Amino acid sequence: MTLTPMEDKGIIPNFNDFKRQLAELLQSRSTVEDITLLQGFLQLVHSKTQQWRGAEGLPATPDLLDAVWKEIHYPIFKWFQQWRAHLLEAAEGGPQERTYISFRRMNGKLNKIFKIIRQFYNGLVQQLFDRYDFGKLLPAGVIRELNVQSGGELQTLDDSSYFTILCVMSLQRCLLYLGCCHRYKCCCSKLSKRFHISDFDDSMRYFMLAKQIVPSVGETYLQEGLVYVQTGNYGHAAYAFMRGSLSRMPTDAGIPNLESIVADASSGLFAKHQGILKRLRSKESDSNKLINREVLEFYFLALFSSVYAPESWSKQGSDIRHCTEILFEKVRSRYARNVRLILQDVLLFIGGFDLVIKKAKAMGLNRSDTLPSNCTAFLETAFDFFSHVIDSVVLKEWQSFDTWEYLALVRVICVWIKSHSIVTQFAHRHTQFCQSVAHLLNNILAHTEYQQLMDVEHRPKRDYFFQEDIMLKDFSAIGHTLSDFNDVDLFQMENLPDRLAGLVDDKLTAKEEGLLKLHAIVFIGKKFLANNDVNIVWCDESKRFNSLKPDVPLRTCSPPKAKTPPPSTSDYTPAGAKQTKKSKPKRNSRRVQSLSSLEAKLMERKGLRQSVAEGRVYSGCSVPAAPMSFDVAPSAHLYQDRAAGTSATQEAATYYNQGYNGPMQLGSTEILNSRSPSGNNRIAFHPSHQAYMQMIQTPQPQAWPTAYGHNAYYSQPTQHPYPMSSQLAQFQNGPIPFVAGPYAMYMPPPGPGMVVLNNGHPMIPNESPPQQHYP
């Protein structure tokens, strides 16, 4: 096989020969008996790969690494995963002693193959550091964590060149695939089906390093989410999938995986989440058995799911209202050891709204000036939760500076409101949230130690990123960074990579950092309350925000532009039965004639939620055995029902990644108070197959391209099986079918023409790149 350098003809190595040889090996009984055949094959592939050199002698480019993983390493790991599944199936009806012996033999062969693959990626990492100086691009702490030895004269990488992008992205790929290798090894090396997060410490370490180097790649979050799926932590998995789909370089598999947990009732993960909720409900009578962390993870996920995909959850057999009450009580009483999880819940609401808006846009519901009622219900639930968190957690602990999450909760919420016009308009009309923010600011300004914050007129400055800023790098729902600080001077300082990682010698104390954060919170909070629509105003005499009184007339606004949609003609009873509304709507009607009546209903929203929540019900933990055929890639979503046709989560992958050209205008005051969609305005979260066919373009045949360019990246996970013959692989305990699906890494088109690295600089190449146009 001939490997042509990229700079000569722009052709990447063709792995067709290797793919054919691998298919023959994996379907041969001799490979099972003698693993040295597979070892020799891997050594040959690695040797040929390392002989190829990219631009300026780069050991490997990101595309070359993607090809090696997709065509060689990933099918091998899936082969071992299938072997393990076969042994587990045989163990159910056969002698246990024979199963253990077979498993030890399989595990020994897996360890030999794993060492060869790990050595390949570690060797490439060492080669990169042997040739190039990453000091201007990576934090010193990350380089120390990699434990690489640099020697001799190194080429300094310029953070404005295209070649630097290739070097950094190649390093990121090596770390990402090292994490994937450790994940598959852990999954295959245990005979038990139960896993703990500590089993994947090595995988999570490499994923964390990959995020620190290039935080904008969503694939890293996707792989973290797959780890959490394996351990049964579906709340953490949902957050990771959301982050992966809302990164600057998103993965198209994030949304389908998320919906497998929270929206697709036919998914195995959805059913497992329901089972966990039923198990927790049975433990509520005994407080000693009910684990607070499980409530904050799984009960919150049920609340989030009920407004993210109400059509899927309205048919379940449990009460969301009861679940919400238990959740709110645990937030109020058990937040101290779970504040990081509460912050994650807040972020899931923030990211989830972006996904709901994208879904509404894809369904063509942004053509009017009215915010869809599904989006309104989502915001209402989210801000109820935010208000409760501020009142029950932040108001008590805002001076506990040693725990950075308390002030981070307020910073994240306020920045999100400021960066999204739809959310801003809604938040200005949410009475309880405005009151919560006003009470928090009053408490801060009433403290004698912080009197100087009363007259702040500018955002504060700082010399390095704080922990929450590092955590939320390239999170598109908040504008890719927390913007409540003025960081213009920061980006001009020396040792910028270390500063953006929070690794500086002259680091402030926790209290000094807290004072800067309070400055930012007071500034952005006063800006927010200056335009509220619930009549909370600043009093110059008392230097406080006044308290909202029900008898104070509310500020009026212009009437909505769009026509008021008709009220729903039907609703659900607590049992799920459909009933026809008989007469004129009563106090809980969703028709609002003026802003004053809207605010009155917002003040009574607890009563409103009581009537509507009765119609919302929910009801889900271990990981199933490996599938009997591999017709999905690791980036693809889980638990597709092939026999039933295309699943809802599979259909959702296409329209979620459509461009989002900005938020819609909120023009209707009637729709703001609507807790659930009416019959005529409900968003179909699982539209019909015909409706999807009108939105989804016909997929093109996917094959590894012969040249660099836009076609060099897969726009979606491949649905075509790995080309292998139909011969059955022979195992010691009998034949077992094998079809491996290729791995497809989604890389979006380089629209902005830049990659943001960990040093914060947008990488806009000054030179004309080779034929490859890498984002």
Curated annotation (Swiss-Prot):
Keywords: Chromosome, Nucleus, Telomere. Residues 550-597 are annotated as: Disordered. Pfam families: EST1, EST1_DNA_bind. GO terms for molecular function: telomerase RNA binding; telomeric DNA binding. The keyword Nucleus applies. Residues 579-590 have a biased composition (Basic residues). It is found in: Nucleus; Chromosome, Telomere. InterPro entries: DNA/RNA-bd_Est1-type, Est1-like_N, Est1/Ebs1-like, TPR-like_helical_dom_sf. It comes from the Eukaryota. GO terms for biological process: nuclear-transcribed mRNA catabolic process, nonsense-mediated decay. GO terms for cellular component: chromosome, telomeric region; telomerase holoenzyme complex. Its main location: nucleus. Belongs to the EST1 family. PANTHER family: NONSENSE-MEDIATED MRNA DECAY FACTOR EBS1-RELATED, SMG-7 SUPPRESSOR WITH MORPHOLOGICAL EFFECT ON GENITALIA PROTEIN 7. Involved in telomere maintenance. This is Protein EBS1.
